[in-house]
Amino acid sequence: MDKLFLLDAYALIYRAYYAFIKSPRINSKGFNTSAVLGFVNTLEDVLKKETPTHIGVAFDPAGPTFRHEAYEQYKAQREETPEAIRLSVPIIKDIIRAYRIPILEVPGYEADDVIGTLATEAGRRGITTYMMTPDKDYGQLVSDNVFMYRPKYGDKEFEVMGIEQIKAKFDIQSPAQVIDMLGLMGDSSDNIPGCPGVGEKTAQKLIAQYGSIENLLSHTDELKGALKTKVETNRKMIEFSKFLATIKIDVPITLNMDELKREEPDEEELRKIFEEMEFRTLIDRVFNREKKTASAGATSMSHNKAQGSLFGDQPSLFDQPSTSPSSQASSQGNLFAEFEDENTENGNYSNLACLENSKYDYQLIDTEEKRKKIIQKLLTKEILSID
């Protein structure tokens, strides 16, 4: 059975970057690898746990989109893209290509619209499709075969949202009404204005009563008091906000399942990039996991038969998955997972520095300048020991 995953690249990249914001991953070259590491971690988690048969990663284009052209203030409130993210994007694209996963990008349209078009068409064909993103506006696209797949965050696991979950989250009768909700209450993350003075609760009440913005605006005579004034005064703004909030499903892109079919990665190129980024433990996990799993399985099989598996009936990451995504917890791939040194994993500490084989120099950090220097130095270290 086909299972298609469509990933919203920038949503996941930003999420990865800010997941490590208090403890950025800086390699020996001084490069902040947080966004790259977090993105790859999430991608690996999906590939290993959910084993999609087809996959694609959608990016926003470099230039403006039709929404920016229609509304100059669209997303204008957002801060400039952090330099670490800007420098990481080309590397992430190289990694995606090394995984042999198609990059989906259409000039003039956001990743939302590209995913919306492909997911809607896939749903029509009966293909089980997961849109991987934390953005709530994707809820409008959910249907019988199309689901939101929200990435894990902290202790929270991946969340799969179908029709009933979207209806419950927004207190609406249909996922399509997500657009009407956003049109009325606005969306601060995208700087969509909505109707001034109308919040989520009022929007829910109005949509429950009238079903859509169009029907509401044709019955404003039934409204009373201040609410009537707000809606009638801001009629055009409400309609325009719905336009901005609507994810397009007719972008000029074709759903080609052959092109989206999952392939084996280019291991040589992938290893080269990981080594450049100094992702030593990730290299071990990605390239040696199956070998280690097979070896461990042969060694422990008789032990498990005698005493039972440590995890009982819990399936491994490599068991054949069900058609719906796994809800099973796994620290591998978690944006917040800690990465041990590969020698620690193997129980080999012989090459680690210690007091007996290292020169050391005690220093008192008693000025702001010294504090800044020690922090900068510590940020370049992979392993830190605190007494």
Language model: regions and residue ranges:
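Conserved RNase H-like, two-metal-ion catalytic cores of nucleic-acid enzymes
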Residues: K3-F5, R15-H54, E72-Q73, Q77-A84, ...
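Extended hydrophobic/aromatic-rich secondary-structure runs
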Residues: M1-D2, L7, K201, H219
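Noncatalytic, basic helical substrate-engagement surface that gates or grips nucleic-acid strands
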Residues: D2-M132, K136-E164, M237-F240, T246-T254, ...
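Non-catalytic nucleic-acid-binding/docking modules located in mid-to-C-terminal regions
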Residues: T51-G56, Y99-I101, R124, S143-F147, ...
